[in-house]
A protein has these predicted regions:
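Hydrophobic residues within well-ordered alpha-helices
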Residues: 83, 109-110, 128-131, 182
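Conserved helix-loop-beta element of the AMP-binding
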Residues: 31, 57, 132-144, 162
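Hinge/capping helix and adjacent helix->loop/strand transition within the periplasmic-binding protein
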Residues: 3-4, 17-104, 153, 158, ...
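Short, charged, surface-exposed secondary-structure boundary motifs
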Residues: 105-108, 145-149
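Conserved functional loop/turn residues at catalytic and ligand-binding sites
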Residues: 53, 98, 112-113, 132, ...
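N-terminal (or domain-start) structured segment
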Residues: 1-28, 67, 91-120, 127, ...
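Short secondary-structure boundary segments
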Residues: 10, 47, 121-122, 140-141, ...
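An extracytoplasmic/periplasmic, membrane-proximal ligand-sensing/linker region
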Residues: 88, 129, 176-237
Length: 237
């Protein structure tokens, strides 16, 4: 297999939206090969929270502008941007409270000091299965096959569909035959039961794409997050 490959994460488009200057072009300086896995973000609350559904969360936020809170792992993080996107589409003003990481946010949720948590499926699904969190919604286009009882955000707010992802890139200008060969190899790899199980263990679903589909995903996410940053006046770094 071609050895000069690197993983690109869903944080790439978000960093483009939140940073003032980049020393590279976020699209042209990467040779897209394929996405390899997607996994949803999860909106959840403590098991003891009176909020039972995502619709109830939105209703509470509408009734209490600026008082219903959501956590993230930092200003400008995907967690933060997703929460603000929900604010925009729902017409609410949930208060953003940033933390240094998921464990700190989790402690505040469990202590009742923050209303809702926006976190990766990797972290959230384990806490939901363990009975500590109640999943209100997943951000993916449809329900996760891993936890199908949790509704999608779009069931309440049509239009909000977002999945975290990992993808493979090579140097720009890599010959197309090499890119196509890599794409075929990753597609075969992702069809294996072993890889499907490994990804499932952290809330992910293996999904390959064409180089063009991966590029389009990145361009769309850059545009979306820039819009969120502009509308919510999030300070660029």
């Amino acid at each position: 297999m071609y050895k000069r490959q690197v993983l690109l994460t869903v944080g790439h488009p978000a960093s483009v939206a939140i940073l003032n200057k980049l020393p590279y072009d976020p699209v042209k300086d990467f040779g897209m090969v394929s996405t390899i896995v997607t996994y949803p973000m999860v909106v959840s609350v403590s098991k003891d929270s009176p909020i039972k559904t995502f619709a109830e969360l939105i209703s509470k936020a509408k009734a209490n502008p600026g008082q219903t809170s959501f956590s993230s792992i930092g200003t400008g993080s995907l967690h933060h941007l997703l929460g603000e996107w929900i604010n925009i589409e729902a017409g609410v003003d949930m208060l953003h409270i940033p933390f240094k990481g998921a464990p700190q946010a989790f402690n505040e949720i469990m202590g009742g000091r923050v209303d809702t948590m926006i976190e990766t499926a990797t972290f959230s699904f384990g806490q939901i299965k363990g009975g500590k969190l109640r999943g209100l919604a997943v951000s993916s286009a449809s329900r996760s096959p891993i936890m199908p009882d949790i509704p999608a955000v779009s069931e309440t707010l049509p239009g909000i569909e977002f999945s975290s992802w990992l993808g493979v890139v090579v140097a720009p200008g890599t010959p197309r035959p090499i890119v196509d060969k890599l794409n075929r190899e990753f597609r075969l790899m992702l069809e294996s039961t072993e890889f499907k199980q490994k990804f499932s263990d952290f809330g992910g679903t293996p999904i390959a794409s064409s180089p063009e589909e991966m590029r389009s995903r990145i361009e769309q996410e850059i545009s979306r997050w820039r819009r969120v940053v502009d509308i919510k006046h999030i300070e660029r770094q």
